[in-house]
């Protein structure tokens, strides 16, 4: 996998927090319900204990980009 693809696939906890703020998710539970995962999964991602799955990272980045285009 190229470095660019790896960079796009991974999402650091700080980027996840930023995406949550941008998209209006105030709690881990809010995000978990919106994307259909458990709150504990979101917690593990935010703590950096488990990586954010590539499809989730890509979805959140697309939603953030769309949100920014609206404003």
What kind of region is each of these model predictions?
Residues 27-28, 39:
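Helix-turn-helix DNA-binding elements, focusing on the entry/boundary residues of the two helices
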Residues 54-71:
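DNA major-groove recognition helix of helix-turn-helix/homeodomain DNA-binding modules
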Residues 30-32:
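Short alpha-helical "recognition helix" segments of helix-turn-helix
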Residues 1-24, 61:
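A short, Lys/Arg-rich alpha-helix, primarily the initiator
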Residues 36-51:
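Recognition helix of helix-turn-helix/homeodomain-like DNA-binding domains
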Residues 9, 28, 52-53:
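Alpha-helix N-cap/helix-initiation sites
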